[in-house]
Amino acid sequence: MTDKSRGLFYVALQFILIFLLVLSPRMESPYGGASEVVGTIGVAIIAIGSGLLLFSFLGLGNSLTALPTPKEKGQLVTTGMYARVRHPIYFALLVMGFGVMLDAGYWPQVIVYMLLFALLSTKAEFEESLLRKKYPAYDSYALKTPRFFPRLGR
């Protein structure tokens, strides 16, 4: 499997999981869905994640690509959101997914969220192997910058 086809596979699977997380039917549960307060908190978290996603997209500039394979004429971005985490787009998706989980209040979303987290972790490892080949400075950037979750107090 080529890097491009592997990247396309990861992206397709990512969209399927996001679709399932957001649009899967809300199954009836004997425990009910989220309370109004928890649902409201979930929606607020989705809004925060959406803002993070927008800033992450903008921060990549011309290096933005839907695939985990770096653009041929792209540059290693280590400023803005990328100074806090190596994969702020994935972080934003995880934040938004957590908000969806809270808003939904049903166990199927928890399972899909865990699958999405596992996929994004695998996709990030693949992407980082390609970034290391393309950008010699990536190793030192990776040593000082967390993968998904920003360090507190930094």
Place the predicted regions along the sequence by residue.
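Membrane-anchoring alpha-helices and their flanking helix-loop junctions
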Residues: 1-78, 95-154
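Histidine-centered phosphotransfer motif of kinases
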Residues: 83-91
